[in-house]
């Protein structure tokens, strides 16, 4: 299987939102999202947003999963920061190296940047995947308003 990582396009909107619904209902997240949020996410990914990018993972015409990144600057580390916001691979395509390929792709595209992501403490499969990609835990409690 030759996987392709490409930017999200308008024709991917329905499938991307379908995957977001599944992802946001999983134990990987503490929020369920909403149709308004899913549409805004995809619209910003396929638009010209300077803050967010969306990607789909494909094998030919078959979409295997998606990812979204957000861009910021880390004053703590003194460099641009790429937040891997969503990384979802359909169940039947997991453990085929798609996540690893995405990490390599994004690290090459944004060489020299800091990469961050969030993971639920009990999501051992994801934690192990991220550790294999050289992510390390930060001892912070995250807060929002």
What is each stretch, according to the model?
Residues 79-91:
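Conserved acetyl-CoA binding element of GNAT-fold acetyltransferases
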Residues 103, 110-120:
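Conserved GNAT acetyl-CoA-binding A-motif
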Residues 54-56, 62-71:
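Conserved beta-strand in the GNAT
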Residues 3-18:
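A short beta-loop-alpha structural element at the N-terminal edge
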Residues 21-43:
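Conserved GNAT-fold acetyl-CoA-binding loop/helix
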Residues 89, 95-108, 128, 132:
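Conserved acetyl-CoA-binding loop-helix of GNAT-fold acetyltransferases
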Residues 44-56:
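A short helix-loop-beta-strand connector motif used in the catalytic cores of GNAT acetyltransferases and
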Residues 116-127, 144-145:
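Conserved beta-strand-loop-alpha-helix junction that forms the acyl-donor binding cleft
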């Amino acid at each position: 299987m030759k996987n392709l990582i490409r930017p999200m396009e308008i024709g991917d909107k329905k499938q991307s939102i379908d995957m977001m619904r599944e992802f946001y209902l999983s134990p990987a997240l503490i929020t369920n999202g909403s149709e308004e949020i899913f549409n805004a996410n995809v619209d910003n990914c396929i638009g010209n947003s300077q803050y967010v990018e969306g990607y789909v993972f494909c094998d030919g015409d078959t979409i295997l999963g998606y990812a979204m990144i957000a861009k910021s600057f880390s004053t703590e580390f003194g460099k641009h920061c790429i937040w891997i916001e969503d990384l979802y691979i359909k169940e039947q395509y997991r453990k085929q190296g798609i996540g690893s390929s995405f990490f390599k792709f994004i690290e090459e595209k944004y060489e020299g940047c800091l990469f961050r992501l969030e993971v639920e403490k009990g999501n051992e499969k994801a934690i192990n995947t991220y550790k294999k990609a050289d992510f390390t835990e930060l001892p912070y409690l995250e807060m929002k308003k």
